Amino acid sequence: MSGNTLGLLFTVTTFGESHGPAIGAVADGCPPGMLLTEADIQLDLDRRKPGTSRHVTQRKEEDKVEILSGVFEGKTTGTPIALLIRNTDQRSQDYGDILQTFRPGHADYAYQYKYGIRDPRGGGRSSARLTAPVVAAAVIAKKWLHEKYGTEFYGYMSQLGELEIPFKDASEIEKNPFFAANAELIPQLETYMDELRRAGDSCGARIEVRARNVPAGLGEPLFDKLDADIAHAMMGINAVKGVEIGAGFRSVVQRGSEHGDELHSDGFASNNSGGTLGGISSGQDLRVSIAIKPTSSIMSPKQSVDLSGKPIIVQTKGRHDPCVGIRATPIAEAMLALVLMDHVLRHRAQCADVSTSISPIPASQPGSFHD
């Protein structure tokens, strides 16, 4: 397979390029009978779409979704759900020079070497524009999981460049363009981005994503562990260079006496595992963190070569996000939802008739707090 499909029983296949006429996804495996409208999907697309603040690309895409199939009289039919998002604000003239050149940090060289041809306009298939249909398809998963299990997803930015953003108040996340849970730091974040843009530079970010009310038992050891598939999906997001589950790399400096999450009849005492044990969900919150690299498209000149290997200087033109992490929160939520949906259906297929005398352990002890 050519890597355009995620999942085994709930699958999402995306198509399109950044400056093509449209982008989209086909979601297959959704159980029949769930109410679904374009308005349901639009809510999350609006959280991700470009041009919503001065700190992101000024490309103005409405990202209006069209449901082409798989829904009849407002209900899913159990057949493939095709979703289409038309591109309306392409400026392909900004990319005329890069057909013969390779932009440092971009996929240009790798795509050209692999395929022998590439669409240079806006990065073509490698553009973060292709995360829009992923977000759209994930609404199907989010809605079904919430109705079936009460599963909830949320994410937030915990670091912008060098600036750490301590978690303060979840109600603030949707009130600012950074998805930051700390209203006090918004002026500082805005100043930081303004200075970065004036310098013609970019920065990275760290995004946290959580899932609550996750059923226990999801995951297929050894090679389709739940956390392995989560990491696989998160690395499929543009510009992601690192993934942590639970304590992640902090596990290196922890002692076993600290890292192991104690089990009590009234709940887990901590969640260093991030919601999985042995690759199977424990019923605790899933805790995932992703590291996003600085945007490669910057105004500052950088050295590169052209198709013939001749040295050149590349200075990127066009409309770009100085930090792609600013719009990454709904994308990370989407990937987590897609993986969970797939594993729920896989678990039902294999273990629906399994009965156990074990009582489920609550996700956390009363009074404990895990963001």
UniProtKB/Swiss-Prot annotation:
Listed as disulfide-bonded, the cysteine pairs are none
Q: Which reaction does it catalyse?
A: 5-O-(1-carboxyvinyl)-3-phosphoshikimate = chorismate + phosphate
**Record-level GO cellular component terms:** cytosol
Family matches, as Pfam families: Chorismate_synt (PF01264)
Q: What is its EC number?
A: 4.2.3.5
Q: In which pathway does it act?
A: Metabolic intermediate biosynthesis; chorismate biosynthesis; chorismate from D-erythrose 4-phosphate and phosphoenolpyruvate: step 7/7
Keywords in alphabetical order, please. Answer: Amino-acid biosynthesis, Aromatic amino acid biosynthesis, FAD, Flavoprotein, FMN, Lyase, NADP
Q: Which cofactor does it need?
A: FMNH2
Segments of this protein annotated with the region Disordered: 260-280
The molecule here is called: Chorismate synthase
**Originating organism:** Polynucleobacter necessarius subsp. necessarius (strain STIR1)
